[in-house]
């Protein structure tokens, strides 16, 4: 005799008890259907099966039979083998996409996830956190950009790097993604300058309260908007508002974005055979950022853009680390346990006692500035670099210095000459 599951047998016996009462006319058939929670049509079908086959007629005939939708055993083994041998470190969503793209396997995501869970390859997801309301996106690209870094083993070999990412709040489009040794003032400035040169000036920047973004006098407390970091000073010069985030939940859009990066980029780098930062950054720039945006970017709520094209010629100066120094009597300034010698200037006999600015550029060269004048250019270790001779213009020496320093464009000087 065919083995009947205990649960199925118990269910059939309960149905039988109700049907016996209906057969004995203690209750009507529609009352029996109401007790069992089924329709009158199903009740008639069960009554016919019971009269013809007895208790066995009440069993679900699908029980114990393989579903016609069931995957062939060979295909099931192929999926498990692919995950075990080739995609062992992929998350389920990423693995499912590869099955469709690379192997022409079109089972549903949920089915693939259940197969991997049943085989013990992945664990069931943790219980979700309490519901939080999502902040609406900004309607236009360029209104708000997120910047953050993710410290992770991107090569899965014990080496830790920061992935520095800038994304648009309106579309989740990635404008910049590069691996760096650490998230710092210099790497953040390089990223922001890249976006401004490629896209234009944006309205606001949303970030955590790391020391290169904000001064926070008390740990966990509010930021001090009166004191500005080097990044804060650069953003103020460009008219970009900086908005601090006070919790990981407040940075939810960026945090979710990094979960996606951590679940995909290490595996993509492994498949591409990339093991170093230089090639990884080239891969990101030339290939992966575009693929990522095609899959995860969304359309903005409104047409248009909030980016404003910039004609500024002084981005080298803006995106530099600036230090104020007092010129000593011998026309030198202190720098990094050494001195920088200011060369004689035709427009002033001595600069002793003047306050000057040392500009530490992203390429690690140094410049000394006094107002609109450049007083010298140096390597990182203080070696003097030769400067090109200034071109004479009708605008005079001051405008020539301004153009060299990037405070006005060459077009402005040309129009003045005319």
Where would I find each of the regions flagged by the language model?
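Residue-centric detector for conserved, function-critical "anchor" positions
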Residues: 1-42, 47-62, 86
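Mobile genetic element proteins and their domesticated derivatives, centered on retroelements
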Residues: 18, 32, 43-46, 54, ...
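Basic, flexible linker segments flanking DNA-binding modules
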Residues: 54-147, 152-153, 217, 222, ...
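Mobile-element integrase/transposase regions
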Residues: 74, 85, 105-106, 117-174, ...
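A generic structural motif
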Residues: 167, 180-181, 346, 381
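Acidic/histidine-rich, metal-coordinating catalytic segments
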Residues: 196-224, 245-248
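Charged alpha-helix within mobile-element recombinases
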Residues: 224, 230-302, 306-317
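C-terminal, beta-rich DNA-binding module of retroviral/retroelements integrases
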Residues: 287-418
């Amino acid at each position: 005799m065919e083995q009947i599951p205990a649960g199925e047998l118990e269910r059939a016996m309960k149905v039988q008890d109700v049907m016996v009462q209906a057969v004995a006319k203690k209750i009507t058939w529609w009352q029996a259907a109401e007790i069992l929670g089924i329709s009158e049509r199903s009740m008639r079908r069960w009554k016919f099966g019971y009269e013809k086959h007895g208790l066995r007629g009440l069993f679900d005939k699908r029980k114990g039979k393989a579903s016609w939708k069931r995957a062939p055993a060979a295909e099931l083994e192929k999926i498990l083998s692919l995950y075990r041998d080739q995609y062992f470190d992929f998350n389920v969503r990423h693995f499912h996409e590869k099955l469709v793209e690379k192997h022409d396997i079109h089972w549903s995501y949920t089915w693939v996830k259940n197969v991997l869970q049943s085989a013990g390859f992945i664990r069931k997801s943790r219980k979700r956190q309490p519901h939080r309301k999502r902040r609406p996106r900004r309607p236009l690209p360029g209104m708000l950009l997120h910047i953050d870094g993710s410290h992770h083993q991107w090569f899965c070999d014990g080496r830790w790097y920061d992935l520095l990412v800038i994304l648009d709040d309106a579309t989740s489009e990635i404008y910049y993604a590069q691996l760096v040794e650490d998230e710092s003032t210099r790497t953040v400035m390089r990223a922001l300058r890249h976006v401004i040169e490629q896209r234009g000036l944006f309205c606001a920047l949303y970030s955590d309260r790391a020391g290169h973004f904000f001064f926070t006098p008390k740990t966990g407390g509010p930021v001090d908007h009166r004191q500005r970091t080097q990044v804060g000073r650069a953003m103020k010069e460009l008219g970009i508002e900086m908005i601090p985030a006070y919790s990981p939940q407040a940075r939810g859009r960026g945090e979710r974005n990094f979960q996606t990066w951590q679940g995909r980029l290490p595996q993509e780098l492994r498949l591409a055979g990339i093991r170093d930062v230089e090639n990884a950054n080239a891969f990101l720039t030339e290939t992966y950022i575009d693929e990522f945006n095609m899959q995860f970017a969304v359309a903005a709520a409104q047409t248009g853009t909030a980016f404003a094209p910039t004609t500024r010629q002084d981005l080298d100066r803006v995106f530099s680390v600036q230090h104020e120094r007092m010129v000593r009597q011998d026309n030198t300034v202190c720098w990094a346990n050494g001195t920088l010698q200011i060369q004689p200037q035709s427009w002033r006999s001595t600069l002793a006692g003047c306050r000057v600015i040392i500009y530490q550029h992203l390429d690690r060269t140094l410049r000394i500035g006094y107002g609109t004048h450049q007083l010298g250019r140096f390597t990182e270790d203080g070696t003097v670099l030769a400067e090109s001779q200034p071109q004479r213009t009708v605008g005079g020496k001051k405008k020539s210095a301004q153009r060299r320093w990037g405070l006005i464009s060459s077009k402005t000087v040309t129009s003045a000459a005319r």
